[in-house]
């Protein structure tokens, strides 16, 4: 059993005998004194099926299921299916585009450190590394009179993700992006 305040995205919980993979958690802090913080959990059934949405108080106990993490490498796309290969035994895992839509903004064929999350031999999602290196494909030109203030501009990366970067970054450069915050960290 895990407290609701300790749940995180991609955890698997068991509710009424059904396994659900957490897709989103919203924290709601009430303004009244003594009121408990609420955690709104949105999840989808493992292996397909109904969606699940529930609110928990921070000290509520929730039944969680142990996940197995396997290092994988992105292999190829087949329609709406994304195929990843296990780095150890070379088995292939198929994930639907809708299940990994948020993670796709950070994954290229060169991305290292991606983990497949498995429950009872079925892959339910991906866990990304803390940061990834991506190529800048499009951005406005650098300004000659760049001031000492930290001004930023939008840059489109090779996965389609748009992040704010410092003015001195130009198209063709590699940048390191924080996957949790979706923000520029540094040049790579």
From Swiss-Prot:
It comes from the Bacteria. One of its GO terms (molecular function) is translation elongation factor activity. One of its GO terms (cellular component) is cytoplasm. Gene3D superfamilies: 2.30.30.30, Nucleic acid-binding proteins (2.40.50.140). One of its GO terms (biological process) is peptide biosynthetic process. InterPro entries: Elong-fact-P_C, NA-bd_OB-fold, Rib_uL2_dom2, Transl_elong_fac_P/YeiP, Transl_elong_KOW-like, Transl_elong_p-like_YeiP, Transl_elong_P/YeiP_cen, Transl_elong_P/YeiP_CS. NCBIfam families: PRK00529.1, PRK04542.1. Belongs to the elongation factor P family. This is Elongation factor P-like protein.
């Amino acid at each position: 059993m895990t407290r609701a305040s300790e749940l995180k995205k991609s955890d698997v919980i068991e509710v009424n005998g059904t396994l659900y993979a957490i897709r989103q958690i919203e924290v709601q802090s009430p303004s009244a004194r003594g009121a408990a913080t609420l955690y709104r959990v949105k999840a989808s059934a493992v292996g397909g099926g109904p969606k699940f949405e529930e609110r928990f108080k921070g000290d509520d106990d929730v039944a969680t299921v142990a996940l197995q993490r396997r290092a994988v490498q992105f292999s190829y796309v087949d329609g709406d299916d994304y195929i990843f290969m296990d780095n150890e035994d070379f088995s292939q895992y198929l994930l639907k585009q809708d299940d990994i839509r948020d993670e796709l903004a950070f994954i290229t064929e060169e991305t290292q450190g991606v983990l497949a999350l498995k429950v009872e031999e079925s892959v339910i999602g991906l866990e990304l590394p803390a940061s990834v290196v991506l190529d800048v494909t499009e951005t406005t030109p650098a300004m000659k009179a760049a001031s000492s203030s930290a001004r930023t501009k939008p840059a489109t990366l090779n996965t389609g993700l748009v992040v704010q970067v410092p003015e001195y970054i130009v198209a063709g450069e590699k940048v390191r992006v924080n996957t949790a915050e979706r923000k520029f960290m540094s040049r790579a």
